[in-house]
């Protein structure tokens, strides 16, 4: 039993040391999105327009590929947006598939900034608001994309 506790503690400490616990990076984004631009890009060309919640030109990246019609547990989806007339990201929205989570296993977070020199700040918006909209894409595992 003591060995099990020691192993669990070591794994927890390793998780925190590696940043997997979601610590904010220097730009204000959580560490779990580090290197998202090297992940698989879901859309072939940038997505223009969209809802007021996610206006601008967007790109969507996934950390893991779909298995059949669903993304596996541990998948992270990152959507970035650049506002019209600007050349810097103003929005980074995330979806993380977590075992046992509601809404198909997805958790949502959104980060914004109003200038290229600012750090991103997390929006305090209820996750249920994201889920209500993403429910429209339930047949695509809650992920909106246009290829």
Task: Indicate where each model-derived feature is located.
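Positively charged n-region of N-terminal signal peptides that target proteins for export
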Residues: 1-4
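Sequence context surrounding c-type heme c attachment/ligation sites in exported
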Residues: 22-39, 43-50, 68-147
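Interfacial loop at the N-terminal end of multi-pass membrane proteins
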Residues: 47-59
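N-terminal post-signal-peptidase region of extra-cytosolic proteins
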Residues: 56-67, 78-79
